[in-house]
């Protein structure tokens, strides 16, 4: 006999929409605005600042992924928090049927993250438009319930959050992704689709940052998830319970204070 465990997956837009709807049913207010800074009074964060107005809060949870790094640095907090730019092809709905998720047996992205977060690379992350280490390609394909595919992925360590990508570079990435997938799924590799990118945050030790900052009251972190759809749902509930006063020893290994730099706020 054999034990077959299929790898589960979710539709990110649908999952996020469902969480927002559940949040509002419980009485929460969902506002969409670009956060430009965190409001700080001495050693306490008291809210967030947007282009429109400031929103006061007794407790702020910074869950901004790759954008958390510049927001923290504006407060003088330096943490080994980085990001990759993930590139993929998204197709329209297709009559082809993929019976399982296809992905590399050995994922190169985690080795890339380790190389890019070495101590001698730290200064490069503070310079704009740098590529810290060469990109990697982990060939994969996944099909969603509406029939559309995501084909990936190339990971780049570009220091700028909005690094410009020319049409030529997009076409080159498209060709690389299709060429890597063609030996495995030739029909899928030729499906028409559009190039996309997104930012994926990670930390120097591979674990997310979950919990309060030891140097600033009123601010907790929930970022650095290199595999968010596995870890975010259970850890979000546990952080909420911890903020409500329920001690959770299981979060100790994820506390931002495990990094020495989290305990210093230079210039403040």
Language-model region placement:
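Helical element adjacent to the flavin cofactor pocket in flavoenzyme catalytic cores
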Residues: 2-59
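Secondary-structure boundary/capping motif
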Residues: 11-12, 202, 231-232
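Short, well-ordered alpha-helices that flank and scaffold nucleotide-derived cofactor binding pockets
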Residues: 17, 21, 25, 73, ...
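Alpha-helical elements of Rossmann-like donor-binding domains used by nucleotide-donor carbohydrate transfer enzymes
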Residues: 18, 34, 176, 180, ...
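C-terminal lid/capping helical subdomain adjacent to the catalytic/cofactor pocket in oxidative enzymes
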Residues: 28, 42, 46, 213-268
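Beta-strand segments within the central parallel beta-sheet cores of soluble alpha/beta enzyme folds
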Residues: 35, 193-194, 251-256
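Short hydrophobic core segments
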Residues: 48, 55-67, 71, 236
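Active-site substrate-recognition segment that forms the wall
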Residues: 55, 66-195, 200-214
